[in-house]
UniProtKB/Swiss-Prot annotation:
Cofactor note: Binds 2 Mg(2+) ion per subunit.
Localization per record: Cytoplasm
Broad class of the protein's primary localization: cytoplasm
Catalytic activity of the protein: Endonucleolytic cleavage at a junction such as a reciprocal single-stranded crossover between two homologous DNA duplexes (Holliday junction)
Cofactor dependency: Mg(2+)
GO cellular component: cytoplasm; Holliday junction resolvase complex
Protein name: Crossover junction endodeoxyribonuclease RuvC
Subunit structure, as described in the record: Homodimer which binds Holliday junction (HJ) DNA. The HJ becomes 2-fold symmetrical on binding to RuvC with unstacked arms; it has a different conformation from HJ DNA in complex with RuvA. In the full resolvosome a probable DNA-RuvA(4)-RuvB(12)-RuvC(2) complex forms which resolves the HJ.
Organism: Prochlorococcus marinus (strain MIT 9312)
Listed GO MF terms: crossover junction DNA endonuclease activity; DNA binding; magnesium ion binding
Keyword annotations of the record: Cytoplasm, DNA damage, DNA recombination, DNA repair, DNA-binding, Endonuclease, Hydrolase, Magnesium, Metal-binding, Nuclease
Amino acid sequence: MRIIGIDPGLARVGYGIIEIKNDKKILLDCGVIETGKEKKEEDRLYEIFKDLNELISHWKPNLAAVEKFFFYRSSTTISVVQARGVIMMVLASKKINISEYSPAQIKLTIAGSGKASKKEVLDAVMYNLELNKPPKPDDSADALAIALTKLNEEGFN
C-alpha cells in the first residue's frame, strides 16, 4: 500500500509518499511543489496540477491524506482554497481515496496532543519513519505527518 500526504498551499505544496511493506513504513519520497511568486495565479495553479499529476503517475499511491483548511482572515485564504481545489481534483481524477484531517487531529494522532509543537510533530515523524535527519523543508515533514495520520487510521501504528 502507498499513501501520499499533502500539505496544501499556493506557494508551496508539501508532499510525502510512504509505502507499507511487510508491516514496515518506508519513506519513498518527500518534498515540495514550489510555484514562483512572480507568476500569475492561474499559472501557479496549473503548475500544481501538472507536478502533482506527475508525482501520482510515478508513485501510484492507493490512498491520499490532505490537511483540512480552516478559514482565517488573511489575504492568502482564497489562493490556498483554490490550490486545495486543484489538489482534490487531481486526486479524484486518479480515483484515489481521499481523507482529510484538521491540524489538531494530525498533532493528536502523531504526537499525542492536539496542541503539539512543530518540533514534537517532527520528532514523531522521524521516529515513525526511522529517519536519522528531519525531512526538509518543513512542508514535506508536515505532509508526512498527514500521511502517517491516515496510516494510523488504517491500523498501521
